[in-house]
């Protein structure tokens, strides 16, 4: 054995070409993927949150709040109609 493994100093990592080659691709790719996820509306579908134009309907102009925790399912069904 050559000895104990030692962590590489962070300054060495930041100044390496390999780090910047990898991260110059992955960081913008993550940013673009997140922007597309939100701008296409897929985030609303995945997490089930209403779109901004679905919070208020013509019939219901007050905030859709669940106030009774024991009948919450019935309230949610009534609010989603």
From Swiss-Prot:
Gene Ontology CC entries for this record: chloroplast thylakoid membrane; photosystem II reaction center
Coarse class of the protein's main subcellular location: plastid
Keyword vocabulary terms for this entry: Chloroplast, Electron transport, Heme, Iron, Membrane, Metal-binding, Photosynthesis, Photosystem II, Plastid, Thylakoid, Transmembrane, Transmembrane helix, Transport
Localization terms from the record: Plastid, Chloroplast thylakoid membrane
A Pfam family it matches: Cytochrom_B559a
Cofactor(s) listed in the protein's UniProt record: heme b
Alphabetical list of Gene3D superfamilies matching this protein: Photosystem II cytochrome b559, alpha subunit
Its membrane topology: Single-pass membrane protein
Cofactor note: With its partner (PsbF) binds heme. PSII binds additional chlorophylls, carotenoids and specific lipids.
Coiled coil: none
UniProt-listed GO biological process terms: photosynthetic electron transport chain
Binding positions (heme): 23
GO molecular function, one term: heme binding
Membrane spanning stretches: 21-35
InterPro entries attached to this UniProt entry: PSII_cyt_b559_asu, PSII_cyt_b559_asu_sf, PSII_cyt_b559_CS, PSII_cyt_b559_N, PSII_cytb559_asu_lum
PANTHER family: CYTOCHROME B559 SUBUNIT BETA-RELATED (PTHR33391:SF9)
The protein's role, per its UniProt record: This b-type cytochrome is tightly associated with the reaction center of photosystem II (PSII). PSII is a light-driven water:plastoquinone oxidoreductase that uses light energy to abstract electrons from H(2)O, generating O(2) and a proton gradient subsequently used for ATP formation. It consists of a core antenna complex that captures photons, and an electron transfer chain that converts photonic excitation into a charge separation.
Similarity annotation: Belongs to the PsbE/PsbF family.
Subunit organization: Heterodimer of an alpha subunit and a beta subunit. PSII is composed of 1 copy each of membrane proteins PsbA, PsbB, PsbC, PsbD, PsbE, PsbF, PsbH, PsbI, PsbJ, PsbK, PsbL, PsbM, PsbT, PsbX, PsbY, PsbZ, Psb30/Ycf12, at least 3 peripheral proteins of the oxygen-evolving complex and a large number of cofactors. It forms dimeric complexes.
Annotated protein name in UniProt: Cytochrome b559 subunit alpha
Native source species: Tetradesmus obliquus
Lineage, highest ranks first: Eukaryota, Viridiplantae, Chlorophyta, core chlorophytes, Chlorophyceae
């Amino acid at each position: 054995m050559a000895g104990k493994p030692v962590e590489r100093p962070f300054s060495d990592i930041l100044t390496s070409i390999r780090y910047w080659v990898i991260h110059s691709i992955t960081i913008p790719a993550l940013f673009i993927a997140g922007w597309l996820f939100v701008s296409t509306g897929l985030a609303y579908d995945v997490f089930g949150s209403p779109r901004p134009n679905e919070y208020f309907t013509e019939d219901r102009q007050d905030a859709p709040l669940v106030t009774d925790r024991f009948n919450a399912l019935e309230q949610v069904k009534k609010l989603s109609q």
